[in-house]
Each structure stands twice: as C-alpha cells, then as structure tokens.
Amino acid sequence: MGMQYDVKSQYAIASGLVLPFRTRVKAFQFGAATSSAGTVGLYDNFAIAGTYTRTTTVATVTAVRHGLIVGDWAFIDWSGGANPTDDFYQVATVVDANTFTVAVVNTGDPSGVATVYNDVLVISTVSTGNDVFNIIPGEGILAQNGVRVFLENSVPLTVYYG
C-alpha cells in the first residue's frame, strides 16, 4: 500500500459534531488541557435515544439494541433538569439487549432522558503539560456516520481523516 495523499484535517475547540460524513480517522492531536487534566474522545455520530432511572450511584439506562457489553465505554448525554454530567461512562452491567447500568454521582433527578453514543472511537486523558498525538495504523478507524467529539477542560483537537 502506497502513501495516501488525500488526508485532510479538522480543528475543534468545543464538543460537538466535527465531521458530518463517513470517513476514516487517520490520526489525532489533543492539545494540553488549560486548567486541569481532561478526558477527551472521538465517537461515531450515531445516537440511540433512551431513558434512565437513577438509584443512588447507579443509573439504569434503557436504549433499544445498545450493543454494549460489560467494560465498554459509551458517551451519555443526559437531558432534562438536574441530571448526571454528560461524559464517557463505563458499562457496569448489561441487563439485556436494551438495558445497561453505569456508575454515576448520587445527585440529580431520579429519572429522565438519555442519548447514548455507543461507538467510541478514541478516548484519552490529557494533562496540562503535554499534547497527545497518535497516528492510527493501517487504514485508520472507520466512523460510519461521521465524527463527534467530547472535549473537557478547554482541550483543543485536530483530527486527520480521509
């Protein structure tokens, strides 16, 4: 396989959709966090609408055909009043094909709406002193529906794709 010449880049300084089309992530660079270490991640732009109930520190999420297994990471966007923080959560248990649980802080509404992004492409923690740069081997990571990012603590991102 020869050199690929059609690699492009996209810069982002806020969470959201950065590439609204099917592509392959070839490399990425997360800049150093400005205030304290931060979690950053890229995930496929495919969301599953769901609901949640919370009992103390456990949120039970119902999202039809979530496809997750214990130990997987999902980005969950909690909607509504006082709710858990939008963030990456590791799946603690899988009840069935439509229900799973995650650990959350014991605060907020006991139930509400949750949007689940179950296809995490890259997740990393960035310190205040160092950038993170990674080249993806082979053909890169396929994002079927585009690339959405979560950037915490003012971490800038450059994603290389093609």
Where are these regions (language model features)?
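Short proline/glycine- and polar residue-rich coil/turn motifs
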Residues: 94-95, 125-132
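Small/polar beta-strand repeat architecture
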Residues: 48-121
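Short proline/glycine-enriched turn/loop motifs at strand-loop junctions of beta-rich domains
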Residues: 33-37, 65-69, 152-154
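Short, surface-exposed binding/anchoring microloops in extracellular/periplasmic proteins
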Residues: 18-32
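Short, surface-exposed beta-strand/strand-loop-strand elements in extracellular ectodomains
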Residues: 35-47, 159-160
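Noncatalytic modules at the cell exterior or secretory-pathway interfaces
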Residues: 26-28, 140-153
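C-terminal interaction-tip segments
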Residues: 1-21, 151-162
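Exposed aromatic-hydrophobic patches
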Residues: 132-140
